[in-house]
Each structure stands twice: as C-alpha cells, then as structure tokens.
Amino acid sequence: MKRFFVLPLIAAGYLLNAQTIGNSPYAAFGIGDVKYDNTTDISAMGGISTAYIWDFNNNFNFSNPAANKNLELTTLKIEGSNENNFFKSNNDNMSVTKHSSYLSNVTIAFPISSKVKFGMGYQPYSSKKYTVLTNEVLGSGNTQASLYRGEGTISTVQAALSYQITPEFALGLRSNFFFGNVYDINELTFSNAELINGYETKNKVKTFNFTLGTAYQKKLQKDRKLTLGATYTLGTTGLMETSYINSTYYYTDGETKNNVSIIEEKFSEDKNLIPMEFSVGAGYGKDTKWFVGTQLDYKKGETIQFLGQPFVNDNSYKVSAGGWYLPNYNNFRNYFSRVTYRYGAYYEKGNLAFNGTNINQFAITGGMSFPFENRSASRMSGIDLGIELGKRGTLDNNLIRQNFINVKIGINFADKWFNKRLYD
C-alpha cells in the first residue's frame, strides 16, 4: 500500500477536533514539547539564569552551574507547574482549552567547601500526548480515515558542580542524563478496505551530555555589581534507539492487532537527539536590593525520525530580560518588605516551521518569593510563586495560535542540615 502522509498540524481544524491533545499541539512533532525551564524563581524573571547569582545563601543555579558563589546552606526544592492552554484556529472559528499539572522540579544542593558547591536534581525534559482523527471523502465516494497518536515523556537527572577560582570568577560543570520513551503511530484506512495500514515509530532514549558554565561578578562602588555569564551544552554523547514499522493489520476487541503483515522495518541509533546549546548573559544590580539582567540563548536544530521520515528542527534562539526587587530584607515589622518581587519577558524564535511560517513564542512573567516569617533573610526558607502569560504560534496559513497561562509554585527548605548549631 502506498503511504499517504499528511502532517496533522496543517489541518488545524482536524487537530482542534482531536479527542486528546497534550499541552500543545506542536508537541506532536519530534521528541515533544520541551518542558525543561529550570526553577520557579528563574522562570518568573523571563528565564534569565546565565548571569544570575542570587545575593543570599539559599539558592543553587542549575542552568549555569558556575553561578553559585553565595550558597552556604543545604537547600531542598520541590516544585510543580499548572499549565492552562487556549488553542484557536480560523478553521470554522474553532477553539479548545486544555489544562495539566505535573511535578516540574526536585533538587537538593549544598556547599562542600567555601569554594565548591554541589547540586542534584530531576526535571521532565519533554513530553507528548495527542490523538488526532481526520476523515476525508474522496472523489470515488470512499472515505479515508487517518488516526495520529503519540505519547511519552523524556526526563532528565542532573548533577552540577561549581568551583570559585577567585572571588570574582567561577567555573561550573553539569552532567545531564536523559531517559524515557516516545511513541508515534499513524493509522490509515479506507471505507472499502478491510485492513489498516500503520506507520509506527518508537524512540527509546538513554543518553547524556554536559553543560559547561562560567560566571564573573565584579563589585562596584555604592554596593553595585556587574555580572557576566556564559554556558555551553554539548550535543548528545549517548544514543537514541529508533525502531520503525510499516505494517497492515486489523483490530479485534478494539486493541488487539491480528493478521499483522510487516511491509517495512527499520532500526537505527542516533546521537543527535538533544541539541547543542549556547547562552550568554549580563546583569547589573545593587546588593540585596535589586537586579536586572538580559540573556541570549541559541539552540542548534537537529533531525529526528517521525513516523518513518526525517523531521528537521530549525535552529532557534531566545532573547530574555528580567530581574528582581527586594524592598528591605531587614524590616521585620513589615512582612511584605521582605518579599522578593520578580518580573521578566522573553521572545523565542522556535525550531518548528510549517508552510514557511515559524512557530514563535512570546511571554511576560512575574512572581514573588515569600520567606517563612520566623526566619531571617540570610537563612531563608520560603515559597516561590511564578506566572507566565504568553502566546505561541499564529493563525496565518491555517495554523494554530496557542495562548497560555502557566502557574508555578515551589517550596525551598534551606538550613545548615549537616552542620547544626550546638545551642539555639
């Protein structure tokens, strides 16, 4: 049977009528919708992290492992995300709303010495879950039905080490281990046919790469400071196993395949699943009072097998700006003077393009960090809140516009767990 392949996103109306869509319809392609976005506080500042060194002693920066000179406490962070997506298409003026919640970050970090800091963490890296059913009446009078299904999650476990070479300059190294499975299938049938033609791709991921980081912070007059940073993430050094099967069959009991006849079967191993990334950033601020920074991220496009065919991701970049403001961390008479207020925005030229149209993204962000009231600001456990309002995609060329409101919450427990005081 000759394969009839149609990218489901091109038919926006069909996709919006889908029975199940993941957090974004664009997750149907490649390894899914990338969820990796670091911690709640960094997300609330537009994602600036490369030149971000927190002024206090209770936070570890995993995005740039070199930017951790002030960490003095053991910190345990547990964070969750709630995503609210609103999809719209000009095709019959259709709209769909989707919600999801998930555990987005678990990390622990502590100082080994005054110069060496270490952290470990878990985050989901990407995910997909979609079901798309399209029907088309052909000129012959027969009906062609295509079912697209996909699901899976890729997660990452990280270990990061920071070394302060001088009071102003530091280096860092982070190892990233990726694991998980991603599955896609396209099933095609006709009203006058007994068999279904299925094109199935399974990607098994068990791979790793490394991120190198540098950070430089110069103290200036009047408690001002200048911070510079850069990171470089190597492309994947492990392998992704991909199996592809083109076969015909029919179902019994709705799930069991019978009379399976394999037309084509392929197996491959690729090293280019996780792309090379590069980031530079700069920031300026006043000690324990305020900070503002900007950042440029670049990600190299890679090719991945999608339903038996190579799917090319374009090179992408992201421009971010943001910062924080703390009114008075020593004012214990006014609690909200000790709350940290965060703000930011970003624009991302995405790695997907359809009909010559790039799928880009823009968002504004904000958030607050609430210290536990019975702690001093220099030894601060607390709760982080973040919000992100933005848009992805476009209504042009029969595509889909995705508006989103994402809410993040995290709890940071910070204390000298391994070096308790003898007297309180």
Kindly give the residue locations of the regions a language model identified.
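Bacterial Sec-dependent N-terminal signal peptides
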Residues: 1-24, 424
